[in-house]
């Protein structure tokens, strides 16, 4: 990249308007130190901060309409938001966006719903307990709803949040519920992929089979499985050996499988619960490659924390998970 910076500097000295466009953050900093304007690819950038899509909205509704909510939902025309100056604005909702409905008389009186077809309807899976797990926060209630919707209704779910918000834990719980339970079975298996910054580049240099190569990356998945299986058998005091045996059973029977990201290309994945953990370390191109591999009856769950990006060429606005969030809204 040094010759590139020198060329840019030479063009500037010749009086030509020059901007260096690169994804490499270090190169941009070095260029600016030399007096060369540098920026990232604008086309791949998504809004940051308050401008990005969160998947939920806080809206107000006339108190008299709340009694009709469970029976027929509430029209979006009756909803409004309040700006910082206290002025009312018509609510602008996106299809499938979750809504927190607040009474205009008593703000603490709230109801939860999902916007579809011009109206906000109650959540369908509010009372469910996938694999015995109960939502403990507002975000987890919305998470549960999105995960338990059918693949036809919600083929792609994007979960974002800091560490400790149960993204991986809840995704596994909902997946196991819909793969292992006969009454609610909707998928053949769970497929887990978990990239990291160097995963696609250096997996071939690790010894062993594909499973042995990716096993270090799946330790967080196994940690969550241990908690879930312990919850399922909470009346029994499971020893370490028995717990390990149950986890091995899931892998040995094909209920749960794990694959490397660079082996996804060219596949058509059907009737599968597909979890992509740490998706903030994927590029937009990689996310597009995953989504286009999905066949009939498959549900894709992208998980990620935008504050924990390890890829040297990605940031909060250019990573694949953020890109998918903005492009696939609705």
Regions found by a protein language model. Give the residues of each.
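Short beta-strand scaffold positions
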Residues: 21-22
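Conserved helicase motor core of SF1/SF2 NTP-dependent helicases
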Residues: 14, 25-35, 39-71, 124-148, ...
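Acidic, metal-associated active-site segment
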Residues: 1-17
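Walker B catalytic carboxylates
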Residues: 277
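Interdomain "pre-motor" coupling segment immediately N-terminal to P-loop NTPase/helicase cores
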Residues: 40, 45-126
